[in-house]
């Protein structure tokens, strides 16, 4: 089975062109291929599929085999893949995901895709739809106790669930300990992604992310979107920001008119390979 490794600011996935290849058990395949020493090593497996409702379809499987609803970094990589591999000549594309249809706009540098803008859709704030088992119509700076310490959490769904915590010192966060405890906390029936965010200016956020099913990653597009929404709701940032992640930077804007979050950033090829197992 042929595949291509790509990354969006360090959030790396193995992409399979399902116009040409067949993946019988993508969940199991994601686990096997994502292992760094026994497989290829990646944050997960992404299938590029035909779609009856959009230009292309996307399915994302995390490193533990669970299926994600949406991934902004993977979406940008697909935009670059389908254009540069000659699968389309369009620069405005639609992508079918488990979270719905997403619009993408490709910015070209010659015959290559330099950057991709993804319409991440509207944030869902109702706890019943995130989902998070807490009362009320919004979870904004709710006090949650973990390991004897109180954390103020804000919950947002950007196609998948996110828990955002604002901190003063990102380096002091023991993410390998705290990440799984937030991810698997009983208030999150479908688990959650976790973002620790430091606001350096009203237009700059720094972030570390613990992804549901993958652990700490260098970047997360839906997580960056959730961080922006949480920062605006908390009165900590403007609606247009740069989010600085371990793998690089993303530009995001939460549009007040259509309520959509727009994300822009790069995507890169790493290598093509063939899985023989």
List the model feature ranges, each with a label:
Residues 124-128:
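Short, charged/polar, Gly/Pro-enriched secondary-structure boundary elements
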Residues 1-22, 118, 130, 135-156:
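N-terminal, positively charged, Ser/Thr/Ala/Gly-biased leader segments
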Residues 86, 129-131, 143, 235-236:
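Glycine-centered secondary-structure boundary/capping sites
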Residues 1-112, 163-277:
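A glycine-rich beta-to-alpha transition motif near the start of alpha/beta enzyme domains, typified by
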